[in-house]
From Swiss-Prot:
Keywords: Ribonucleoprotein, Ribosomal protein, RNA-binding, rRNA-binding. This is Large ribosomal subunit protein bL9. GO terms for biological process: translation. One of its GO terms (molecular function) is structural constituent of ribosome. HAMAP family: Ribosomal_bL9. Belongs to the bacterial ribosomal protein bL9 family. The keyword rRNA-binding applies. Binds to the 23S rRNA. It comes from Brucella canis (strain ATCC 23365 / NCTC 10854 / RM-666). PANTHER family: 50S RIBOSOMAL PROTEIN L9 (PTHR21368). NCBIfam families: L9.
């Protein structure tokens, strides 16, 4: 099905472009969301008549998103989850969790605006991309830890998945004195 885009949509095109998309994508997403019109003569004329108004609305939404992006850019958010000794989470942190944490901090964000290829399953600092508008993206830091104290240590650059961090001991190779010589082992046998 051919549609006329009413706003910029990533991987499809700019506002006003006529693109061919799968019927289901058009019927179930683009048309109900008001992001596109069917590409016929009547809708082409309607779009051209409203083009200036649509561009003004798009610019306004972009400016609002840019204002939020300026506040959000470089922010760090702490997520406390239970995890094993090696840093593997018991569960995962998904786009929904990240959106809830950012929203709790006073920003308006939906989970589909958080771009995450796969759920986060380890503690540590993770950079996450947030798309506030098709033309405005921002990166935030998500600090996943077992406690707020651990999150503070991670923020300072400490690796909490090492033996030293887990058990509070320094990693040292065992000296030769600890091992018995093979000759002594044979004498005792």
């Amino acid at each position: 099905m051919e549609v006329i885009l009413l706003e910029r949509i990533g991987r499809l095109g700019q506002m006003g472009d006529t693109v061919k998309v799968k019927d289901g994508y058009a019927r179930n997403f683009l048309l109900p969301q008001g992001k596109a019109l069917r590409a016929n003569e009547a809708n082409k004329k309607k779009f051209e008549g409203q083009r200036a108004q649509l561009e003004a609305q798009n610019l306004e939404r972009k400016n609002e998103a840019q204002a939020v992006a300026d506040k959000l850019n470089g922010e760090s958010f702490i997520v406390v989850r239970s995890a094993g000794e090696t840093g593997q989470l018991y569960g995962s942190v998904s786009t929904r969790d990240i959106a809830e944490i950012i929203t709790a901090d006073g920003f308006t964000l939906h989970r589909n605006q958080v771009e995450l290829n796969h759920p986060i399953k380890t503690i540590g600092l993770h950079e996450v991309s947030v798309s506030l508008h098709p033309e405005v993206q921002v990166k935030v830091m998500v600090n996943i830890a077992r406690s707020t104290e651990e999150a503070e240590r991670q923020a300072k650059g400490e690796d909490l998945t090492s033996i030293e961090a887990i058990y509070g001991i320094e990693e040292q190779p065992l000296s030769e004195e600890v091992f018995d010589d093979e000759d002594e082992a044979e004498d005792q046998a």
